[in-house]
Amino acid sequence: MVLKVYVSGMSGNKEVKKRQQRVLMILDSKNIKYDTVDITEPGKESEKELMQNKSTSNGGTVSDPEPRHPLPPQLFNDDEYCGDYDAFDMANEIDTLEVFLKLAPADTTAVSTAQIELKQENGDAKKEEAETEAEDKKTEAGDGDVDVKEEAAEKAEV
């Protein structure tokens, strides 16, 4: 499955440009692979029509809350519609971006499982070290108590 982000390279709307940049920045920061489709390039009319026909959210902005056609950025997983900027931003905020983008669970959990196992192994090693140190201290403290008691007994005899 290929994540596609439909953008407009020639938009005069600053809010649309900022939204496009934010979507791409978030995807890059989360190492999510995607293809950018610039609907304003010559020969991309079919992609523009696909975006406009399959988008269920119009991506309204402050300056144009009810646009006639969906505004970029619009996100698709292959040809399956994921959502517009507002839905993307909300999914990012509540940490459900992978579900929103309809990414395969194996793609995102493989790394997470490996990291969790590594942390558990490291945690077990640290736990064993701490237990060993605690036993050593108990042994040392125990020997020290015997010496203190013997010294006290010797002083009492004198």
Swiss-Prot record:
Residues 52-61 have a biased composition (Polar residues). Coiled coil: none annotated. The keyword Transferase does not apply. Pfam families: SH3BGR. Gene3D superfamilies: Glutaredoxin. Residues 40-51 have a biased composition (Basic and acidic residues). One of its GO terms (molecular function) is SH3 domain binding. Keywords: Phosphoprotein, SH3-binding. The modification Phosphothreonine is found at residue 109. Residues 40-74, 118-158 are annotated as: Disordered. InterPro entries: Glut_rich_SH3-bd (IPR006993), SH3BGR (IPR051033), Thioredoxin-like_sf (IPR036249). A motif (SH3-binding) lies at residues 67-73. The keyword Translocase does not apply. GO terms for cellular component: cytoplasm. Belongs to the SH3BGR family. This is SH3 domain-binding glutamic acid-rich protein homolog. It comes from Drosophila melanogaster (Fruit fly).
